Amino acid sequence: MLLTPSFELPPRAARTLISLCLSWAFCQSSVGLAQGKSDPSSGAVAAAVRDGAHDFDFGAGTWHTHIKRTLDPFDDKSPSMELDGSVSSRKVWGGRAWLEEIQADGPKGHWQAMTLFLYNPQAHQWSMNFINSKMGTLNSPLIGEFKDGHGDLFQQDTFKDRAILVRGRWSNITADAHTYEESYSDDGGKTWKTAFMARKTRVPASEIRPVQETPNDFDFHVGTWKLHTARLLKPLSGATQWTEADGTVVFKKIWDGSANLSEIHTDYPTGAVDFLALRWYNPVARQWFLSFATAADGQLGTAMAGQFKDGRIDFYDQEPFNGKAILVRFSMWHGAKGQPVSEQAFSADGGKTWETNFRTDYTRVSSN
């Protein structure tokens, strides 16, 4: 049994079963999300903890961005490059998550990226998850919070083979402008060197141009769908008892179709479950990747990879399950009536045999 009545998230493979099978748009099975917890030692302190779930509300809309990037922030003589472009930001989960699409032009041509901001209600912190369209890889998140009118998120990284700290800061926030600055520190945060500066000004609604859409692998799935799931209660145990549930999926394009985000809501007898599924294409590997987040802990899990062949896509991953390493396969295709179907299976013998433990059927509600 991987889905507990209280909906506490079980181990990685257990969360995989919950998430992957709730939506055809969701193929993540490698989770292990760190869950922050507030300090219960003082009722007064806990009561005073600030709810930052709407910290990024200022970013809603479309913005012009002017970017300056310093190639080596630790070298005072380092060259820099400048880019101009646009940023479109919209809220998800009523503001507990935000999706930011970025495109800009500079000396090296056109550049696209996206950022998914997720709020952790236990830790009262935000995570910033960034993907560059040219590389198609998900960076480790910056994590932090807003205080005194600005937001600081931090991450440990390497620069020229040296360990550094990275700080992302939002400041100078008004209704029509704000600044994002990314700085590096090689002395434990005593001093910071600016590596990236983006100054954003709001674009009036009358000047916003519609995005030109292009065909991609998942264009058919754009829209709203009803889902019906059937789940095996005890995988890899010889059990044959299944349970069923219904829900909805709202699927939207990003980057004109080379990435997408789906919002998943499923109703179980013991309560509702909400997920986000973020999927993007890696043009170098020619593979699709997908990761998910739950409303409970507001962090993205590790992504699976897969690719289409003959109208079907199969994603594979290795996961711990009941103390043993297993293989997880998640597949998507079109059924007899042309509607999407997804299926998850586990293998305990290295892929020689597979046991299906989840199936989802979808019915279109609307195409937008």
Model region roles, listed by residue range:
Residues 30-34:
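Sec/Tat signal peptide C-region and signal peptidase I cleavage site
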Residues 1-12:
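N-terminal secretory signal peptides that target proteins for export/translocation
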Residues 16-28:
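Bacterial N-terminal signal peptides
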Residues 35-368:
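Hydrophobic small-molecule pocket/channel-lining residues, especially in calycin-type beta-barrels
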